């Protein structure tokens, strides 16, 4: 007679094989725990358990939907005064309530890098919601379509120009105070970036930096040509020998009267993209970041940080600290927006199908166990 513990050790593989034939499960990853030795007394009451199986449930490819979460960090850097401001709203419809009907998820982010004092940037932060969504007749729609996004772009364009005029009308703000402005909006799978100035938005697409804005500086050929046509000039890399950017809100001491062509304008440039599983996160930063590092270097730092701790707030701080280490000479503001709950995507795709755990248990009576023993014994 074979000892009980030995019988148990032989039975487990037999039952596993039988289970696989009955279920005909495709794509099964199996983890088999070791079978512990048992006393003969315990063997008769033992329950033989099929090891836990990892079954990849067949699902249809799902349309990507961003799972938005973000973090930000701001630091005065080596400057005596802080002139940067920023806005971070991960749930825009939740923030605005009935004022907004738009495709979900939806979010709004803004970075304002002031110059000539903090007043213009502070004004933009204080009044951004009113300027962008309340006064601008922001379009209302629950479905994603081309006409909605065209209306959004037109509305944001008007908001930039309205903000510029508002800064001129506010007597509490110096006419020499101005600010760059970059706004990023997410509606459903669409990412829209509007920029006037040298803040920058950079998308990480499978680890590769994709710039979603262009720096409006005198060294940019298209801007240089426009400035010359308007009667302006570039001196030592500065617009009219004074300003390092060619687009900004405010700075009315440098702008022509309303209605006249001016070398310095508040007109935003737009870039739009449809987010996919390949799009991991977006970095928005002021020029204090980009003056000392490339877009790809910034993406690499944030990506490594997310792999270590998965915290966009910490990533924003780490990026700013890297800029300080590289001896930036400006204020620092960074926003990191992730599009998935984990690095590398949002909704599960067919290649990353959800895993379902299946446990199948079978207890054998003493009689059944004896029958198995007899069946396994060699014929004499």
Swiss-Prot record:
Mn(2+) 1 binds at residues 113-114. It catalyses: O-phospho-L-seryl-[protein] + H2O = L-seryl-[protein] + phosphate; O-phospho-L-threonyl-[protein] + H2O = L-threonyl-[protein] + phosphate. Its cofactor is Mg(2+); Mn(2+). One of its GO terms (biological process) is signal transduction. One of its GO terms (molecular function) is metal ion binding. It is an enzyme of class 3 (hydrolase). Residues 69-339 form the PPM-type phosphatase domain. Keywords: Hydrolase, Magnesium, Manganese, Metal-binding, Protein phosphatase. Mn(2+) 2 binds at residues 113, 287, 330. The keyword Manganese applies. Its EC number is 3.1.3.16. InterPro entries: PP2C (IPR015655), PP2C_BS (IPR000222), PPM-type-like_dom_sf (IPR036457), PPM-type_phosphatase-like_dom (IPR001932). Binds 2 magnesium or manganese ions per subunit. Belongs to the PP2C family. This is Probable protein phosphatase 2C 2. It comes from Oryza sativa subsp. japonica (Rice).
